[in-house]
Amino acid sequence: MPFDRPSRQSYRQTVTVLSLEDLAASTPPGTPWLGLDLGEKTIGVAASDTTRMIASPLSLIRKTKFTDDAHAVLKLMDGRGASGLVIGLPLNMDGSEGPRAQSCRAFARNLQRIRAVPCAFQDERLSTSAVERFLIEELDLSRKRRANVVDRTAAAWILQGALDRIRVAEQT
């Protein structure tokens, strides 16, 4: 995939960060979405099924430099036929955005410069904590084994939350 950088004016037109409802309306039915949990060292990746009912952990990308990370995400999207991304947005407990949330927004913005991918943000407050608690209490995984699954499982948690939110919105 070439790195054609759009002009500032055309760049504004290619940015496709949407609300979850608009993401659902603008992506073809029968295509999965990917969910991302952007950590400091890794990117957890999850995928939905084609009905967008169930999210499952998919992969873990070890972060290197942005272009490599972006290409890894886009390769997974292409391989799964995914039409959209749900990116976890780590809000503070009071709902404000701190440095980690700004970093996630920057990732989405920079990804759009490579390819205009429809994406939306999903509040991910406490997702990693909830997943770790589940892995400890329910599955009794050791710290070492948890480290290998927590980020991609958190991505599935984030994506499942978005899918559930869309389903509830469609029923009302």
Give, region by region, the residue ranges found by the protein language model:
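Phosphate- and other anionic-substrate recognition elements at nucleic-acid/protein interfaces
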Residues: 3-6, 10-36, 41-172
